[in-house]
């Protein structure tokens, strides 16, 4: 049986861009041009995840992760053609972000090739920020070095928590001690670093969250994101909550954890610049 298709907006029937994409910015300035590339593959699907991603089991026989870059290349050319039809001027991308899923399920050469295709189709601005998300357990030092040599500039690692029982609830399979190791490797390769954290997991205490914040600050990435857990209907975690196996996160608890994060990160020299993001000066993305 083929996997169910993700729910979302229907594909455009005409091949044209939505009107809001082609519209000028409200202030009359030129809109910055960025490219997001999605890699919809994971080794294990986390119980809270409602993103468009598939495991090898979900893809079924005959499916190939390696074929994805070829398909993505076609999609980028279609996007460029739609922009041309809309009369949008060709502008090099100022930022490229590869998300997922787990982009580092691909071999490094495929990620580098994806960025190269963006350069061929749209161009890359001088000093463009090129980021990929990464699971700490899917990379080693050689992998990160290959990314840096291939033109990527930044890696965002999915740390989520420094507390083992919280990682277990979130279905994360890496060990907490893996995160500082991969950040060191990334720095040696010349890559900027970011860490993603999640707060509000069932069973996570305020002390657990404090430990995660302290661990993240000690690692000292250039950038940090902290997201409140949202349990979406249809996910495995939603079913666990419905069955009474896990408690639903409480709004007051998540609000207190957000305030704790802001205070801890501000005290460590990180500047809040967007709802869920803090950065060292100059490291905003």
Where are the model-predicted features located?
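Long, contiguous juxta-domain segments that are non-catalytic but functionally important
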Residues: 2-26
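C-terminal scaffold of the Radical SAM
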Residues: 17-34, 52-85, 91-285
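Local cysteine-cluster metal-coordination motifs and their immediate loop/turn environment
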Residues: 38-53
């Amino acid at each position: 049986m083929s996997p169910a298709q993700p729910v979302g907006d229907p594909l455009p029937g005409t091949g044209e861009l939505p009107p809001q994409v082609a519209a000028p910015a409200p202030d009359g300035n030129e809109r910055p041009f960025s490219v997001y590339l999605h890699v919809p593959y994971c080794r294990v699907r986390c119980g809270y995840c409602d993103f468009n991603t598939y495991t090898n089991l979900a893809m079924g026989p005959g499916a190939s992760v390696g074929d994805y870059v070829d398909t993505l290349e076609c999609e980028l050319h279609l996007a460029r053609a739609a922009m041309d039809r809309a009369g949008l001027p060709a502008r090099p991308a100022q930022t490229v972000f590869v998300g997922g899923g787990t982009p580092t399920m691909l071999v490094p050469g495929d990620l580098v090739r994806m960025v190269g295709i963006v350069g061929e189709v749209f161009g890359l601005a001088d000093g463009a920020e090129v980021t990929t998300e990464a699971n700490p357990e899917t990379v080693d030092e050689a992998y990160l070095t290959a990314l840096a040599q291939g033109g990527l500039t930044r890696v965002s690692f999915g740390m989520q928590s420094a507390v083992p029982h919280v990682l277990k609830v979130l279905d994360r399979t890496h060990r907490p001690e893996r995160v500082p190791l991969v950040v060191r490797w990334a720095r040696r390769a010349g890559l900027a670093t970011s860490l993603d954290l999640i707060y509000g997991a069932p069973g996570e205490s305020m002390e657990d969250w404090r430990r995660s914040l302290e661990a993240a600050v000690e690692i000292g990435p250039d950038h940090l994101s902290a997201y409140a857990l949202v349990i979406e209907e249809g996910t495995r975690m939603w079913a666990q909550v419905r069955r009474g196996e896990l408690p639903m996160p409480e709004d007051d608890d998540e609000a207190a954890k957000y305030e704790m994060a802001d205070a801890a990160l501000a005290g460590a020299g990180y500047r809040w610049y967007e709802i869920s993001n803090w950065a060292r000066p100059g490291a905003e993305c």
